[in-house]
């Protein structure tokens, strides 16, 4: 990857160059194909970057469940990745995550990249509620009789049940240190 600017975990560079390790709803298990990708791609790329190589990641949960459950899932998914990467000999000091249980910023980025027709409406609702709370979810569910919520649920929420990771030179990583 040839990147010359800071990479944030919500920008298109990260989204396009990271691998989403996607989880089943309410689960934290990592698939065999993802383990193969880590072994055959991620680790060699990280080694090629030398001492400055880190893994940049974003651990998330989709917003359809209760917020406390989404917090638990995002943290547990991060812990699952840490444990797996540790088994491959990767020190957690070389892993930088944003942990975002209900990832509305990433949802908006994905919608923008897809030129989704509902983006302006969804963005307005998310901003109105400052990206938090049950009122935000309730309002999204009411829009157009649930049509927009169902669209988000089918098209984008599966992508939010993930830990997205990529190898990168640490000088190019721009992470927001959130409490784990």
Model-derived segments and spans:
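Short, surface-exposed beta-strand segments enriched in small/polar/acidic residues
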Residues: 47-75, 85, 96-105
């Amino acid at each position: 990857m040839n990147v010359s600017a800071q990479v944030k975990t919500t920008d298109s560079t990260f989204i396009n160059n990271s691998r989403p390790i996607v989880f089943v709803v309410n689960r934290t298990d990592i698939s065999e194909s993802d383990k193969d990708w880590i072994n055959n791609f991620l680790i060699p790329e990280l080694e090629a970057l030398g001492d400055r190589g880190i893994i940049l990641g974003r651990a998330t949960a989709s917003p359809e469940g209760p917020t406390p459950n989404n917090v638990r899932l995002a943290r547990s998914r991060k812990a699952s990745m840490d444990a797996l990467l540790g088994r491959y000999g990767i020190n957690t000091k070389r892993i930088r995550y944003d942990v975002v249980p209900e990832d509305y910023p990433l949802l908006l980025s994905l919608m923008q990249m897809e030129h989704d027709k509902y983006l302006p409406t969804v963005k307005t609702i998310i901003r109105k509620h400052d990206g938090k709370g049950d009122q935000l979810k309730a309002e999204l569910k009411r829009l157009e009789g649930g049509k927009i919520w169902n669209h988000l649920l089918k098209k984008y929420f599966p992508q939010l049940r993930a830990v997205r990771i990529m190898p990168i030179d640490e000088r190019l990583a721009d992470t927001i240190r959130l409490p784990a």
